[in-house]
């Protein structure tokens, strides 16, 4: 076990070498414990963070994995250590089976062991064996009968053992983690959150527990509540908030602030550098995101983690040469990683070779059918191929994997809109706006949907919400003007059209032309001839000369002549 989250300091007083020593020792302890339990991804994360600390700061810190506090005086821990010593030989045998992926054999070997470490490895082996079997039973992709949350047959046994242990007062953090995993898989998120919070309070640098906690959180409100129940100054609480904000696609200034604080302790952390790139991507600053990802890849040339997101950035920027190079690099590193297949799929999509793109996204899902982005991207490709049925199926499966992914909900809305099923589309756009409340695109799509079903008041509210993201979207302002005109609210319509004209930068756009012609008619109706003439002259002085504007100008001049008679 490790020093608790409550006893660890945050980022205040970073000059204090004792704090850095404590963080370093906890990371070393976590690496040791997770390695013994076969939690390889947690080991990798902790090792990367350890190497992300400033070497200058570490020179004065002695190599030690002994935890701080009165760990050795805990009588329960002393008894636990005694059991581990007694079971060491059989544990090493079981761990060797586990490392060879003989999970059932490992579990069987440990069936009579009593230490928490042995019980964890036995139950974790059972869990992985059950996951493997459920995968084998559902190998066919895009089968309408496929349920991605197919039940792991070992869940009942694992739950029964864990509940008995918790009833007996066993608070081993790794067993708490396993309980959280099982409850999350069974879609009992509130219970999962409770167990995972207890786990991270006891083992704060155990990253796998934080990942599971993030997967159990489906909204920014829930995230805020969970974080408020954890020590706010602890560095792991801050890192978790950054990661969970990205997973929820809810990036705010608080996430950037917490990331900056973490970077003070881990200035060389590649993980944190990647988190900054991901936050920048979520903020839709694609040029900056590209620069950050390029720097990451330069310093870590064999990295594949999150490089699929880098390929998304290059796709949006339509940078075919860089995306093609990235696909070649990824393929040379490991052609059987889901990230590699996704990168290649994005490359073919950018070349408009959508059938090839689908092939690679399917390949990614054959390697990991819970690989969320591939389901969503495959849905996009099916839309391009006009295969709406397959697109809907892909998006639905994406939602099954992760209900907080706004892209899948948005994709469903767009697909049903193509099918002119606007009430269905409305529901999915509403889900997308709930997950992405500050994204102009979501509200614009919702407003358009309300227009299609003849609900102008709701459309106006949606478009106005979209404008909170940017007051300079001329197409939204024109739509608002049209809606107000339909409702006979001409003053509000005029206000929208005037705002539209203010968005104009250099050249006159089709939207501002329409706005000027409408305003000219409006001023003409009020006999404000000079103002009407001014709007029309601005249209005619532009690059586009419209017959409608010319005709209106002739009418205006005729009226002006009669008014002087």
UniProtKB/Swiss-Prot annotation:
GO terms for cellular component: anaphase-promoting complex; mitotic spindle pole body; nucleus. Gene3D superfamilies: Tetratricopeptide repeat domain. PROSITE patterns: TPR, TPR_REGION. The keyword Cell cycle applies. TPR repeats lie at residues 87-120, 173-206, 270-303, 338-371, 373-405, 407-439, 440-473, 475-507. Keywords: Cell cycle, Cell division, Mitosis, Repeat, TPR repeat, Ubl conjugation pathway. Component of the anaphase-promoting complex/cyclosome (APC/C), a cell cycle-regulated E3 ubiquitin-protein ligase complex that controls progression through mitosis and the G1 phase of the cell cycle. The APC/C is thought to confer substrate specificity and, in the presence of ubiquitin-conjugating E2 enzymes, it catalyzes the formation of protein-ubiquitin conjugates that are subsequently degraded by the 26S proteasome. Has a role in promoting metaphase to anaphase transition via the ubiquitination of specific mitotic substrates. This is Anaphase-promoting complex subunit 8. It comes from Schizosaccharomyces pombe (strain 972 / ATCC 24843) (Fission yeast).
